[in-house]
Amino acid sequence: MPPKKKKVTGLIKLQIQAGAANPAPPVGPALGQHGVNIMEFCKAYNAATESQRGWVIPVEITVYEDRSFTFITKTPPAAKMILKAAGVEKGSGEPHKTKVAKITRDQVREIATTKMPDLNANDLDQAEKIIAGTARSMGVTVEG
């Protein structure tokens, strides 16, 4: 008889600073209500994201019936990557009136290449269009 599959009891999506997960909110309460060992998750997450310090990394945590868990880390949000490439703190309050920065087509290609596994795109051209659209909606002009 094949081994039984674990029954999934919850899916938690969080965005946590890489290498800096701690039991304080928002991590503690989100995991606590599902009965997950918070310190175990924090140690595993920090070890997995140590190389990406400085970024906010989205994570998808699957919680099973026996309170064990698995997690998948995603690539940093496109908006954060665009802001870093443009060298600004935040996007424009009114993106279609006031532009806050400019990024080059090469920077867009670089971000699209990094984000490719998480994007709903079949090729790099489509991925670049998605990233350029995100940039436009933040008041960042794409040149080239």
From Swiss-Prot:
GO MF assignments: large ribosomal subunit rRNA binding; structural constituent of ribosome
Entry GO CC: cytosolic large ribosomal subunit
Domain of life, source organism: Bacteria
Keyword terms of this UniProt record: Methylation, Ribonucleoprotein, Ribosomal protein, RNA-binding, rRNA-binding
GO biological process terms, semicolon-separated: translation
PROSITE patterns on file: RIBOSOMAL_L11
PTM notes: One or more lysine residues are methylated.
Annotated signal sequence range: none
Gene3D superfamilies per the UniProt record, alphabetical: Ribosomal protein L11, C-terminal domain, Ribosomal protein L11/L12, N-terminal domain
Assembly information from the UniProt record: Part of the ribosomal stalk of the 50S ribosomal subunit. Interacts with L10 and the large rRNA to form the base of the stalk. L10 forms an elongated spine to which L12 dimers bind in a sequential fashion forming a multimeric L10(L12)X complex.
Protein's job: Forms part of the ribosomal stalk which helps the ribosome interact with GTP-bound translation factors.
Family the UniProt entry places it in: Belongs to the universal ribosomal protein uL11 family.
Protein name (database record): Large ribosomal subunit protein uL11
Organism name: Streptomyces coelicolor (strain ATCC BAA-471 / A3(2) / M145)
Lineage: Bacteria, Bacillati, Actinomycetota, Actinomycetes, Kitasatosporales
Protein's gene: rplK
